[in-house]
Amino acid sequence: MILFAIDYLERVWTLKVPSVFSYYSTRMILAAITSLLLSIFLGPYFIRKLYELKIGQSIRKEDCPLLGQLHEKKQNTPTMGGILILSSMLVSLVLWMDLTHIFTLILFVTTVFLGLIGGRDDYLKLKYKNTKGMSARGKLFFQFVLSAAIASYFLLSSVNEMFEKWTWFQPPVIKEQIVVKNSETLQEMPSQTKSISLKEYASRLYIPFFKEPVVTFGGISLILMAFFIFFVITGSSNAANLTDGLDGLLAGCLVTAAGSLCLIAFVSNHVDIARYLNILYIEGSGEIAIYLCALIGASLGFLWYNGYPAQVFMGDTGSLTLGGILGVSAVLLRREFLLGIVGGIFVAEALSVILQVASYRLRNKKRIFLCAPLHHHFEYKGWPETKVVIRFWIMSLLFAIIGIASLKFQ
């Protein structure tokens, strides 16, 4: 909206608005501040309303009885606090992002769509007073629908051509460097850039610490890329959901993971920095950076009330959606494997559950961990909740640093 306002004031009222307000860096800062302040100042009113509506959290006791004792004080703490986070982010989106860019549309649809799924999941848990909620198949189906829509836009020429023709949304412009070597000295000559199509862009698979794509899909093999997109979005969404089990744990880990992707999105939108790092120049990826800044601000504001002892939980409304936003952002930036590094805590949490279930079924009910996800295992070992959270935050920060460093060490 800020860009519309600037254009209107300059075109209709002939007022000269400082160009600083159109800079990506400025809008990133303003988006973070907006969502942070909204989360903090609306938090008390929102939490009070949740108490009045008796939207309390149920505690998992079935397969980990000790959790009922450890988390007894958390019983009936309000949940669905993700509504506060998502609302703050969407306000920032409307105020500070370019509403004509396709990345803005994709991130908006992702937030609303996954927010509704998470909200439905929380509603069923509250209705039946248990921790089951929606069936796993039901959630996977809707996550597949979202992933299929995003994959179709990038991989099917007819779909993105339709958007270019019939909508006002600007497609991203992607350029790669062409490095020429002198045949005699074998030294690299000044690089040039060439534009690549959305389909070619989306068909490439990049791995951290490697400059060039390791695989480029084409033809029928594009189906594999579509399933890979589904795996990334669904995996990140559900992994974040599994991580949301201790006061402040997920919010803190989201800040570091989103911060890493935010930095990558910002430098990908800068011609000179992209050339220096020898990465793809993605015109418009700054919009992703703005939204991730809004996510960071909203998460920090929510952490104000979600830190130990938590006054509110984000619930699946927040965790499923925020994890999905990270996954979608990684897909848009073609940094899916990098997300596996910067979101290392999410990967560890998800793997702990997968290994625990597999071991229980295949090894005659033998368990690898005392309790899964991983953070509960350390609780069972006697670690205080705050110590588990802080140590996981430290590891999350370490993973984020490694992920960012991979851009330089290619």
UniProtKB/Swiss-Prot annotation:
GO cellular component terms, semicolon-separated: plasma membrane
Pathway: Cell wall biogenesis; peptidoglycan biosynthesis
EC identifiers of the protein: 2.7.8.13
Cofactor(s) listed: Mg(2+)
Transmembrane annotation, as ranges: 27-47, 77-97, 99-119, 140-160, 213-233, 248-268, 288-308, 312-332, 337-357, 389-409
Pfam family of the protein (one): MraY_sig1
GO biological process: cell division; cell wall organization; peptidoglycan biosynthetic process; regulation of cell shape
Coiled coil (UniProt feature): none
Catalytic activity, reaction form: UDP-N-acetyl-alpha-D-muramoyl-L-alanyl-gamma-D-glutamyl-meso-2,6-diaminopimeloyl-D-alanyl-D-alanine + di-trans,octa-cis-undecaprenyl phosphate = di-trans,octa-cis-undecaprenyl diphospho-N-acetyl-alpha-D-muramoyl-L-alanyl-D-glutamyl-meso-2,6-diaminopimeloyl-D-alanyl-D-alanine + UMP
Domain of life: Bacteria
GO MF, one annotated term: UDP-N-acetylmuramoyl-L-alanyl-D-glutamyl-meso-2,6-diaminopimelyl-D-alanyl-D-alanine:undecaprenyl-phosphate transferase activity
UniProt keyword list: Cell cycle, Cell division, Cell inner membrane, Cell membrane, Cell shape, Cell wall biogenesis/degradation, Magnesium, Membrane, Metal-binding, Peptidoglycan synthesis, Transferase, Transmembrane, Transmembrane helix
Matches recorded under CDD domains: GT_MraY
Membrane topology (UniProt): Multi-pass membrane protein
Enzyme class: transferase
Localization per record: Cell inner membrane
InterPro entries, per database record: Glycosyl_transferase_4, PNAcMuramoyl-5peptid_Trfase, PNAcMuramoyl-5peptid_Trfase_CS
Family according to the record: Belongs to the glycosyltransferase 4 family. MraY subfamily.
Task performed by this protein: Catalyzes the initial step of the lipid cycle reactions in the biosynthesis of the cell wall peptidoglycan: transfers peptidoglycan precursor phospho-MurNAc-pentapeptide from UDP-MurNAc-pentapeptide onto the lipid carrier undecaprenyl phosphate, yielding undecaprenyl-pyrophosphoryl-MurNAc-pentapeptide, known as lipid I.
Cited NCBIfam families: mraY
Protein name: Phospho-N-acetylmuramoyl-pentapeptide-transferase
UniProt organism field: Protochlamydia amoebophila (strain UWE25)
Classification of source organism: Bacteria, Pseudomonadati, Chlamydiota, Chlamydiia, Parachlamydiales
Gene responsible for this protein: mraY
